[in-house]
Amino acid sequence: MEHLLHYVWKHKLFPLKVLQTTNGLPVEVIDSGLQNPNAGPDFFNAKLKIDGTLWVGNIEIHTHSSDWFRHGHNCDKAYDSVILHVVSEVDTEITRTNGEQIPQLLLTCPENVQSHYHELCVADHYPACYPILASLPKLTIHSWLTALQTERLEQKAQLIMHRLELCNSNWEDAFFITLARNFGFGLNGDAFETWAGLLPFRAMDKHRNDLFQIEAFFYGLAGLLENTFLKKEQEDEYSIRLCKEFRYLQRKFEIGQGMDVTLWRFLRLRPENFPHIRLAQLAYLYQKGDKLFSRLLEADTLTDVRALLDTRTSSYWENHYLFGRLSPQKEKTMGERSKDLIIINTVVPFLYTYGLHKTDERMCERASRFLEELKAESNHIIRSWSDAGPVSYTH
């Protein structure tokens, strides 16, 4: 039931009657807030009017009011910012850590909605709505998918704007950090973002024309040059030179230590996806030229975008996947499918966010056009929806 309440709150699927707190004060929901997938209140930065007074803060949702105490929120200062407690059953008043009462809203769902929700939850096929998709008009499905695409882009835009704020409004830095995250292709996404957040971009700009020095920055801050990580047999002339260069750059620019090397994942990865190779490709891309995001803003076609994302590695990595371990000679370029994933997850969201920020509708339309021209990702979720029938015509 709690998950259903989340959905109802997020999409503001409220009853037509005026919403009221449990003590009779009128509630107007201006903004339901940003859903939080991590620890803490369920929705951040909601905007409400309670009895005519504007409130901005967080929302917590439970099935029963008493769940607030059962989960220990009354003793957790992280929940003092909650401005409204949304529940389907009221069985007690709730308080902040200082004893102050928090307003509560009783939100009920119609019986037929609850019944449909239960049917979908217990369905043994995916997607759960599989049996009814074929009966829906194509226009309905197309409109729904378009709305979902816009919603997804707006969610990514919020994350990008947060990252931009951390980068002091530098679009190039924020773009590179996002690009790095998506070079992790899922498994190493968090590690790549952590690493990219350590990069001293202004210092690296002074050495951009030297690929070896860029690699020293990259591998050093990734923790991959540490003696605790490099086994003796992995030390070779190249890794030793990189390590010495990184120590020099550390002193020159007063750079801190590299990241915790245990954050990198290698298990079940194909060698082409090892962090060493992806870092080498990023180094080549970074060294190739500055203002990458600015150049992407001027790219009118997917062909232009793919050309800007063309990357390879330094010659050392053409016969290595790890330091000190020879492998058959092979140029480590990025395949077209990998490029398209980068476009879907990095370029398109950034173009869309930039268009929103600059009120440039043309840029938002270009982002949407690129998405429509690209083939969908090939994963079990996409395949399941495609097998359902009516969805396949949209690709």
Residues covered by each model-derived region:
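Short Lys/Arg-enriched alpha/beta "domain-start" segment
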Residues: M1-E28
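Compact, well-ordered interaction domains used in eukaryotic information-processing assemblies
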Residues: H73-A78, L84
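Internal, well-ordered alpha/beta segment that forms a basic, Gly-enriched binding/recognition surface
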Residues: V86-A203
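Cysteine-centric segments in proteins
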Residues: E2, H6, S32-P37, F43-N45
